[in-house]
Design a protein with these regions (language model features):
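Right-handed parallel beta-helix/beta-solenoid
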Residues: 5-14
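Core SAM-dependent methyltransferase catalytic element
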Residues: 75-82
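Short, ordered beta-strand-loop transition motifs
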Residues: 5, 68-71
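SAM-dependent methyltransferases
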Residues: 1-2
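Intrinsic-disorder/low-complexity, polar/charged segments enriched in Ser/Thr/Lys/Arg/Asp/Glu/Gln
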Residues: 10, 37-41, 73-75
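Amphipathic, hydrophobic secondary-structure cores in small proteins
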Residues: 15-68
Length: 82
């Protein structure tokens, strides 16, 4: 069993109030600013990100580590893989 702490995000974004396609545009820009293997986390309010972020990650070659909705907030974490 590992005793390491979970990896902290290298970058955090507040995407609340942005509508499609801006959350994807912003995460795509942010992922280029971090090192391979690093995490970018974001909070959004547009329910479209529940489908858009996983689709973008698949086509871009990155990994969605967290995607959760609580009330009207959606929190997600993406790992840069390439």
């Amino acid at each position: 069993m590992s005793t390491q702490s979970p990896q902290a995000p290298a970058l955090s974004l507040d995407l609340k109030g942005l509508l499609c396609p801006m959350p994807v545009v912003k995460i795509a820009q942010a992922i280029k600013k971090v090192n391979i293997g690093d995490l970018v986390e974001a909070t959004a309010t547009d329910p479209g990100v529940l489908a858009d972020i996983p689709a973008w990650a698949r086509t871009s070659g990155h990994e969605v580590v967290v995607l959760e909705r609580q009330d009207n907030l959606i929190h997600f974490v993406v790992r840069r893989l390439k």
